[in-house]
A protein has these predicted regions:
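Phosphate-coordinating catalytic segments in nucleotide- and nucleic-acid-processing enzymes
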Residues: 48-187
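Pre-Walker A-like glycine/lysine-rich segment at the N-terminus of P-loop NTPase domains
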Residues: 1-47, 57-59
Length: 187
């Protein structure tokens, strides 16, 4: 169970610390004051290994387009250059942090047959780089993956450790949960 939780730069929350969390908690407040954002941050924190959770949160808020602007809705002040950080402690001594960064890069595609290497076009790609750090019994593990939305509201995810571009890419419009979600990608 989570005992302490911090939210940095997520939606309308610049910084929020929740301490001494119990098994039953109430969030009370006016409309549009951030109650749902706290729950969404907890959702990302509790299951960070599912590669399209970030995009699913936007869909729940009816931001159905998977484009650069809709991804920036996750960041405080719509500032994609900031870092979302979700940090928490568990009652079993585990410490966990989830970081989400927005990125844009220029990507080069060659023709499908890869024979006409002089005929290349460059376009911008964008997505979210998610990093999970987990410390259990003094041993830290780090999990990395990137999520790139596609036009059909699906996403592609790949591990940072892959040396070949997109060698192990998984197309994921929906991925069923794994028995142990923290085994998604082990760095």
């Amino acid at each position: 169970m989570i005992t302490n939780f911090e939210i940095h730069n997520f939606r309308g929350i610049r910084l929020l610390r929740l301490e001494d969390i119990k098994s039953l908690n109430l969030l009370l407040g006016y409309n549009n004051c951030g109650k749902s954002s706290v729950l969404e941050a907890l959702y990302l924190f509790c299951d960070p290994s599912h590669p399209v959770n970030d995009i699913q949160i936007n869909r729940a808020r009816h931001y159905l387009r998977a484009d650069a602007r809709s991804l920036q809705y996750l960041f405080y002040g719509l500032d994609g250059s900031s870092l979302i950080a979700l940090v928490g402690n568990m009652d079993n001594g585990e410490k966990r942090s989830v970081e989400v960064k927005y990125y844009e890069t220029e990507r080069t595609h060659s023709d499908l047959d890869n024979l006409h290497l002089t005929n290349r076009n460059v376009n911008k790609t964008y997505g979210l780089h998610n990093i999970l750090r987990q410390t259990i019994n003094g041993i830290e593990k780090t999990y990395n993956y990137k999520v790139e939305p596609r036009d059909n509201n699906s996403a592609q995810t790949f591990s940072e450790k892959d040396k070949k571009d997109y060698a192990n890419m998984v197309s994921c419009g929906y991925m069923p949960p794994r028995s142990n979600p923290l085994n998604y990608i082990d760095s």
